[in-house]
Amino acid sequence: VGTPLLARSGRDAHLTEAGEVLARHATSILARLSAAEEEIAAIAGLHAGCVRLVSFLSGTSTVIPPALAALRAERPEVEVTLSEATPPRAIAMLRNGDCDIALAFRYPELPGAAPGAPGTHPQDPGTEGEEDADWDGLAAHPLLTDRLVGLLPEGHHLAGAGKLELADLAGETWILGCASCRRHVVKVCESTGFTPRMDLTTDDYPTVIGLVGAGMGVSVLPELALSSLPSGTVRLVPIVPTIQREVVALTLPAYESVPAVRLMLQHLKSAARLAGQALDGTSLPPR
């Protein structure tokens, strides 16, 4: 390439700036080669196809199961692998060629916020490095919008309210879930004039629900995470103004023409429509 790619220091070697550029482009090239091989093999009828899925937790438990069932019913010979990862990690896997489709989500930027700025907070060190990953250059297939709702213990004095503003919970102890969600909730709370006191954080949504039900605090969670909410433990209250995240299926543009990937995307969209209808059918007011 006409310029050194490695620099040596004693027994060690590291990439030069030119080497880092080449390595970054190489991962994209390898991913495109993998897609080309898959497409050629499918067209030639050498094998039925394989789809590697990565999804965030609440997507794995709601959208993914009916989509996989529909795919198996239509094309039982298609192989599918599934793993879980946060959106930043899932997108990195997609760019590195380690998966074919990544389910991800992101929240809209707040007015006055720097685009892409990481919302770290001293009470929440787990958010560091979890800023929303860049979707540039990826093919995004919209699936649904997922709003956040308030969770209160049954005996809470606001449990019977028809709606809540986050400021109504300013003096409460908060229990929040995944890093991306709690980072955005903290940003919204701070924009309304207070910082939530987070004594407990966990990426496990059933744990959040259990802690709220036990009276340990209040929470705000995505509706998708509440699809199997046990009855009689917590009270759901809509948050105003509405806070919602965009849920999408991401893939590389080169993968969209691979038959198995294209079919999986179709079934993900159908499953997402059903999930959205199920959310609209809850006891909460219409979305």
Show which residues each predicted segment covers:
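Flexible hinge/capping segments at coil-to-helix
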Residues: 113-120, 124-148, 152-174
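Secondary-structure junction motif
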Residues: 105-106, 152, 158-162, 172-192, ...
